Amino acid sequence: MELNTKNFGIIHYNEEDVIYFEEGIPGFEELHNFLIIGDEEEDMPFKWLQSIDNPDIAFVVIDPRVFKPDYTFEIDEELKNFLAVEDVNHLLIFVIVVIPEKIEEMTANLKAPIIINAENNRGVQIILDNDKYLIKHPILEELKNAYSHA
């Protein structure tokens, strides 16, 4: 299958690569089908969550544990059932990154992680019910530190 995207031109993908968000993404509830775009071989922590339903929409995402190793939250039974999770080790965790003109002001939304069950490609974005994490968490310095210690 192929998709003509705004950011990447034509990309080829297989049906089994499609991640299904039953509820969409908050603010984009009408979008349900996405791809993760990013080269595993490259030493780049960022990936793209590319909408198939609207090829003009793509979100920059990152595994928050790359820059914040202590990032954790509870995955309750309701969430496990919703994603049909058999093994929590198969869950992928991403957060949406905003990269403004001034790169120093780059932030990640730690308050609303994206969780994907890699076993069945079901995904959801949840909003954490605590004050531990910010919607606009500055990440540039933490990324620099993570890569200087790698």
From Swiss-Prot:
Pfam family, one: FliW
Gene3D superfamilies reported for this sequence: BH3618-like
Primary subcellular site in the record, as a coarse category: cytoplasm
Stored InterPro entries: Flagellar_assembly_factor_FliW (IPR003775), Flagellar_assmbl_FliW_dom_sf (IPR024046)
Biological process, per Gene Ontology: bacterial-type flagellum assembly; regulation of translation
Superkingdom in the source lineage: Bacteria
The keyword tRNA processing belongs to this UniProt entry's keyword annotation: no
Record localization: Cytoplasm
Keyword hit for ATP-binding: no
Subunit field text: Interacts with translational regulator CsrA and flagellin(s).
Protein name per UniProt: Flagellar assembly factor FliW
Gene name per UniProt: fliW
